[in-house]
Amino acid sequence: MTPADLAELLKTTAIVVLAERGLDAAALPQTVTVERPRNPEHGDYSSNLAMQLGKKVGANPLELAGWLAEVLAQAGGIADVEVAGPGFINMRLDASAQAMIVNTVINADKNFGHSDDLAGYQINLEFVSANPTGPIHIGGTRWAAVGDALGRLLSTQGAAVVREYYFNDHGAQIDRFTNSLIAAAKGELTPADGYAGTYVTDIAAQVMQQAPYALSLPESEMHETVREIGVDLMFTHIKKSLHEFGTDFDVYTHEDSMHASGRVDEAIARLRDTGNVYEKDGALWLRTSAFGDDKDRVVIKSDGKPAYIAGDLAYYLDKRQRGFDLCIYMLGADHHGYIARLKAAAAAFGDDPAIVEVLIGQMVNLVCDGQLVRMSKRSGNVITLDDLVEAIGVDAARYSLIRSSVDTPIDIDLALWSSSSNENPVYYVQYAHARLSALARNAAEFGLIPDTGHLELLSHDKEGALLRTVGEFPQVLKTAAALREPHRVCRYLEDLAGDYHRFYDSCRVLPQGDEKPTDLHTARLALCQANRQVIANGLAILGVSAPERM
């Protein structure tokens, strides 16, 4: 019996009890949940449903909990029910019901933990979206890991997710990048407002290989030629780095295309029709303050050129026209002002602002020998995705970036994350999977196969703890997806790995010496098979490998 099964049983019980007592069953929450109590002596699972319902239905919570406990105790799979405190319902499962989770996992295989909660939702998930003026920096790398994991997580809940990269190839920063390439190609100093680093020199050399005539062209043609080739080369490098990091996108949208295709003009025309733009001081303004922004925003500047927000407006409208129900933007720590701005833009088009979700990620630092690492060999003044992968590898890089809530700054200790020790969280989890894989190989050599026919024999305390943690996986995914918090998967996997290591130290899985195999051995093998599957499923969501040998 999974926690979800138990929660459904509790809900069904509540409906029966409320009806019998003439109380309003409509007061029941749509979703009933059960939780693991902090103190194992309080049972396997606990619920505060009686306290939630008491006031709503006009019943004493403690008395209501007693009524619920009386009926629950008669249900199959329930070993014991107790009422505690002001109305907590503490439940213990019998060994057979608790162990049924093993069958559930083995039958579901790679799909264990998946649900259809978000079926029918079309979600656009935009992340990284770094300017093509340099390699992906460490902050963008955090989004490359977290965004990809969030996309996988939402997909497990049934959503149709499109991962999208918005390619900012329009505006002043591209001009500065182009001027930097031209200066490097000419052997001149980097412009004061330009981009430095050996990558600029490398790309400039590649531009000259592709267009050796470029510097002899008239200035405007030279600028356009270098711009087009240089930006394409930079973006090719960015995509290659992301792919090697395990992050790929379904769609790449160019900001320049929003302007060239007339999308910006279309968006502004739509806003004129709604009356949500006005002219002032020779510029065109969007009434974002009417929709929660701190001030109105210029859309078309007094010189007739579109402001940056014009591209954002066109891009949002483009997403909605492609049929997305939810648009998630993952932005850096310096983009807090965009939250109100993007929601106001949605409202200005007549949409519910809730269609827009903005996640803000905090800073990332690398630490080596207790000191912050501040410089990169290639990019000069920032640490890049490639630097991090070179230092600790893809798996550790992804896991270290996903493991913390995005609203928390993180320091990545390079020595810790490159170590083969239990203090390294990704090693700890991967080692559990490798250990389980070795166990399966050793069992096969004995001629033993997992057997779910005697799961009721799994009655040891450490077996019970492991079974309960395995059973929590679907709820962990459900909660992590709803809160957009893939770090919860990391923390869960660490708990699961810990429960497995403690189980293995206390419960012998394979026969030793001349010992004959028993039903308990094969039942424990089945538990290990389920455990291994859940770890593999969790690591897959994170985009981290599940090694069979370490």
Curated annotation (Swiss-Prot):
Q: What is its main location?
A: cytoplasm
Q: Which GO terms describe its biological process?
A: arginyl-tRNA aminoacylation
What catalytic reaction does the record list?
Answer: tRNA(Arg) + L-arginine + ATP = L-arginyl-tRNA(Arg) + AMP + diphosphate
Molecular functions (GO terms): arginine-tRNA ligase activity; ATP binding
Query: Would you say which domain of life the source belongs to?
Result: Bacteria
Q: Where in the cell is it found?
A: Cytoplasm
Which EC numbers does the record give? 6.1.1.19
Which UniProt keyword terms apply here?
A: Aminoacyl-tRNA synthetase, ATP-binding, Cytoplasm, Ligase, Nucleotide-binding, Protein biosynthesis
UniProt-listed InterPro entries: aa-tRNA-synth_I_CS, Arg-tRNA-ligase, Arg-tRNA-synth_N, Arg-tRNA-synth_N_sf, ArgRS_core, DALR_anticod-bd, Rossmann-like_a/b/a_fold, tRNAsynth_Ia_anticodon-bd
| Motif 'HIGH' region positions after renumbering to this chain | 130-140
- Record keywords: Protein biosynthesis included? yes
Spell out the coiled coil positions from the record.
none
Task: State any GO CC term.
Answer: cytoplasm
Q: Which CDD domains match?
A: Anticodon_Ia_Arg, ArgRS_core
- NCBIfam families the UniProt entry points to: argS
Family recorded in the similarity comment = Belongs to the class-I aminoacyl-tRNA synthetase family.
Assembly description: Monomer.
**Entries under HAMAP family matching the protein:** Arg_tRNA_synth
State the protein's name. Arginine--tRNA ligase
Which gene is annotated as encoding this protein in its UniProt record? argS
